[in-house]
Regions:
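CN hydrolase (nitrilase-like) catalytic-core segments centered on the catalytic cysteine
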Residues: 1-70
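ATP/NTP-dependent adenylation/nucleotidyl-transfer catalytic domains that generate, transfer
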Residues: 31, 57, 83-128, 132-322
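Residues in well-ordered beta-strands of folded domains
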Residues: 35, 76, 283
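Hydrophobic residues at beta-strand termini and immediately following loops
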Residues: 37, 65, 75, 180, ...
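A short, polar/charged loop-to-alpha-helix boundary motif
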Residues: 68-87
Length: 322
């Protein structure tokens, strides 16, 4: 007897090993061959990675399809217990490096979402920081540089280094980019609000106005050219509310929404090993939103090396805060 398991199991960085262990156990318990067939493709925020597998009745895996690739594969099964696999097994396609598998999942998700929703391309707000740099790389690897546009939107608080790094990244990736200063609309908002604010000291209100001005510019390009805005926020920031509603959260798809900040750095370094496109300044400098003078993320948050493990325990492992 052969058991066919037709599945639509979404991707998770640890799920493939969980699947293998569970299917192997069930196959050996039932003394039955198991053919596990999984969906490939993206559907909104979900990514289905494929990784279809065949296990013999001893619980040994005798075939696994490549990740994130549709295909028709063959494997011969001797129901007496002797497996005869064809060359289509392709074990070399299995990824031993976690960063490679996760990066490929992110690229696959962007590609499927954009194509299935018939967008003409995507637009990314490029700040000179690590999150937008990685998002731009993912977009280009998914869609090609001709279908990606970068928008650099400096303010009075944006350092020359940030603008230079953003331009260097865009030029290395051969992507079209435009520079639009937000100083004029930001100043106009401050002037309009001056009678209401009555000389109250500047705080996060003015910081959020800058982020929202950038969101308006990105959405204007999206509407005019039918391009999807890719939000660039990561899971660490979203989990603690270190983001601006209708500002940097604006976008139709967020590739890094389930990626911790520390993992963002790991993925950026991995991508640079393939081709060094992200300037070292972007990877090495302390993270900053640059919404006020001398601002650093660590002024408001613990270092991400400390914060991320805490958030992971609380959010993903459901541990009690105490």
């Amino acid at each position: 007897k052969i058991l066919f398991n037709i599945n639509a199991s979404p991707y998770d960085k640890n799920k493939n090993n969980e699947r293998k262990n569970l299917i192997s156990k069930r196959a050996s318990e039932a003394s039955m061959h198991v053919v596990y067939v999984n969906l490939v493709g993206g559907q909104d925020e979900l990514i289905f990675d494929g990784n279809s597998m065949i296990f013999d009745k001893k619980g040994e895996m005798i075939f696994q399809s490549p990740e994130f690739e549709e295909g028709l594969y063959e494997a011969q099964i001797n129901i007496e217990g002797i497996e005869n696999k064809k060359e289509l097994k392709k074990e070399n396609d299995l990824y031993s490096i976690e960063e490679e598998s996760i990066y490929k999942a992110l690229v696959f998700g962007v590609k499927d979402y954009v194509e299935k929703n018939n967008f003409k391309g995507v637009v990314v707000g490029l700040s000179g920081g690590i999150d937008s740099a990685l998002t731009l790389c993912i977009a280009i690897d998914a869609l090609g540089s001709k279908n990606v546009e970068a928008l650099i939107m400096p303010s009075r608080y944006t350092s020359k280094m940030s603008t230079d790094d953003a331009r260097a990244l865009a030029e290395k990736l051969k992507v079209e980019y435009k520079i639009i200063s937000i100083e004029a609309p930001f100043s106009a908002f401050l002037q309009s609000l001056e009678p209401v604010f009555k000389k109250l000291p500047m705080d996060t209100t003015e910081e959020n106005i800058q982020a929202r001005v950038r969101g308006v510019l990105l959405m204007a390009i999206s509407n005019k050219y039918n391009k999807l805005v890719l939000a660039t926020g990561n899971k660490s920031e979203m989990s603690v509310g270190y983001a601006t509603l209708y500002g940097d959260m604006a976008g139709g798809y967020s590739p890094l929404k389930d990626v911790w900040k520390t993992l963002v750095y790991r993925l950026a370094k991995w991508r640079n090993k393939e081709q060094e496109v992200i300037p070292e300044n972007i990877i090495d400098r302390p993270p900053t939103a640059e919404l006020r003078d001398n601002q650093l993320d660590r002024d408001s948050l613990p270092d991400y090396e400390i914060l991320d493990p805490i958030l992971e325990q609380y959010i993903e492992l459901d541990h009690h805060p105490e």
